[in-house]
Amino acid sequence: MIISAASDYRAAAQRILPPFLFHYIDGGAYAEHTLRRNVEDLSDVALRQRILRNMSDLSLETTLFNEKLAMPTALAPVGLCGMYARRGEVQAAGAADDKGIPFTLSTVSVCPIEEVAPTIKRPMWFQLYVLRDRGFMRNALERAKAAGCSTLVFTVDMPTPGARYRDAHSGMSGPNAALRRYWQAVTHPQWAWDVGLNGRPHDLGNISAYLGKPTGLEDYIGWLANNFDPSISWKDLEWIRDFWDGPMVIKGILDPEDARDAVRFGADGIVVSNHGGRQLDGVLSSARALPAIADAVKGDITILADSGIRNGLDVVRMIALGADSVLLGRAYLYALATHGKQGVANLLNLIEKEMKVAMTLTGAKSIREISRDSLVQNAEALQTFDALKQNNAA
């Protein structure tokens, strides 16, 4: 199969993965309107083409939380990453490390912190939820610090799990789920050999280390359902801010006032995100939410964005809308499921190439030069900055 874009990896991953795994990462909440709008709104952003600008010295390098990045991207935290390729977190982290960008390990990863951190040179980032079990949170933070993790990504848009209808149909949940998953596994031999047999253990590594016993998929579903805490507030984050002495990023911001609260709280960064459309259907896409948030806090806090990014052109669009950098989620997971570490490495190379083309043709020699001026702002560009801002205000 010819791979020339992230969409090719998605098609390949759908053939390789058991349906319960493919649809778990591919799907969203409820009727998936926000999931679709994430991609559509971003693709509708019109860039301003410029010519004869002497683009021979173009650079994608940037600095984020005092870390030098080869390009303004990081790999987002993705739960169960190790179920998509053999020891998937290790492979994805290696590809990011080789490229010179950060990898973010999820709380609910298959590979534990201690397995992933020693395999890379660059300090990885660690993602954590606010959970009822504060003992687990403290244990995870202590282990992340001991492993040299540099940045804490705190996910705050999951006080309760989202309603993901696809999961019941695919076998991730619903009647006879375990039997359905088993049948899917044995009928997808490439995955069964690579991950099912040779990717063991299939524990939730960070949780197993804390509980002192193996944890499987059923434990994952049950543990998360019982531990998300709908009572959380900014006050619950204060002890974490005191405990964690590195950069702290709040992930799951869609409203300018919440962004201002993050600044007042003392966070180092925010991620404009709707959890990839996996939590509440009907909320704004990240592309629509981003301009107003950038107006509110740009310069006061580092702004990252995710949800809907599928290529290097989308990265440039997000930066033009106000982000300093982006997180890649689904796009890299499709590549990981298809060709492991090499797939992720190839995807990152594709994104780099696509960014260079977009920057060359918009006249931006550096990441700093990508701005609102890179967008078409007239009546015909219905989904550019002004239109996005109006939609957000409405």
Swiss-Prot record:
**What EC number(s) does this enzyme carry?**
1.1.-.-
| GO MF terms, alphabetically ordered | FMN binding; L-lactate dehydrogenase activity
The record ties this protein, via InterPro entries, to: Aldolase_TIM, Alpha-hydoxy_acid_DH_FMN, FMN-dep_DH, FMN_HAD, FMN_hydac_DH_AS, LldD
According to its UniProt entry, the protein's GO biological process terms are: aerobic respiration; lactate metabolic process
Q: What class of enzyme is it?
A: oxidoreductase
Q: Which cofactor does it need?
A: FMN
Q: Which residues of this UniProt protein bind substrate?
A: Y24, Y129, R164, R278
Q: Does the keyword Cell inner membrane apply?
A: yes
Q: Name the PROSITE patterns for this protein.
A: FMN_HYDROXY_ACID_DH_1, FMN_HYDROXY_ACID_DH_2
Record: active site: H275
What's a single GO CC term here? plasma membrane
Does Cell membrane appear among the keywords?
Answer: yes
- Gene3D superfamilies under this entry? Aldolase class I (3.20.20.70)
Per the record, membrane topology reads: Peripheral membrane protein
Name the Pfam families on file.
Answer: FMN_dh (PF01070)
Keywords linked to the UniProt accession: Cell inner membrane, Cell membrane, Flavoprotein, FMN, Membrane, Oxidoreductase
Q: Which parts of the sequence bind FMN?
A: 106, 127, 155, 251, 306-330
Q: Which family does it belong to?
A: Belongs to the FMN-dependent alpha-hydroxy acid dehydrogenase family.
Q: Which NCBIfam families does the UniProt record give?
A: L_lactate_LldD, PRK11197.1
Function, as annotated: Catalyzes the conversion of L-lactate to pyruvate. Is coupled to the respiratory chain.
The protein's name: L-lactate dehydrogenase
- Natural source organism: Klebsiella pneumoniae subsp. pneumoniae (strain ATCC 700721 / MGH 78578)
